[in-house]
């Protein structure tokens, strides 16, 4: 009988609620438990580089897992995309648009672009829509997308660019056009320092399984795996989520997309 292990998992703040649900299913299927620590991707990356004893890292981008790979800190072949995030504009109790926000004096909450991938995506969106210069002085930056959400839900900031996965039934929000920010492609890796490589590999296989991906989709993310002809799961080509082609940004479409009648 296999020994049940406890895996220490560093997870981007936006994915923590989803991971908590996944952890229950993973324990039911394998007996292994997860000890979850959540923060912004940038903070977790710095902790890992400085020797934090995690087995697995679930990032909100693919750049930092790639940097860990370049440093020789991950198990070979362990980097996989597990989800794609999506930005929404959210103002509790009333709907708004970015163009309306541009023209009024309301503060806007975003995650800190320097350490949080959702914040970088928000900055790209605002810059490519020509709105950044109007709202920059009114930005309130959270240390993570979770803190950004808390700014808005508490009423301290009236509107925010947050993750779709943070919305619940009944929330009114506007999905931002993904053409205007680079894909929020969330990757995971197994750290080379892990003392539980077999259990960690089981976790990666579980996250990429059809049942886990269905749960991830139900939490507001895009699934990034599909079944191959032989029934095995493979990562999708992200053709419809390609990086921004800034030369093709259509200002007329911006107005028609974001201004209400």
Regions flagged by a language model, labelled:
Residues 2-29, 35-38, 42, 46-52, ...:
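Exported/periplasmic ABC-transporter solute-binding proteins
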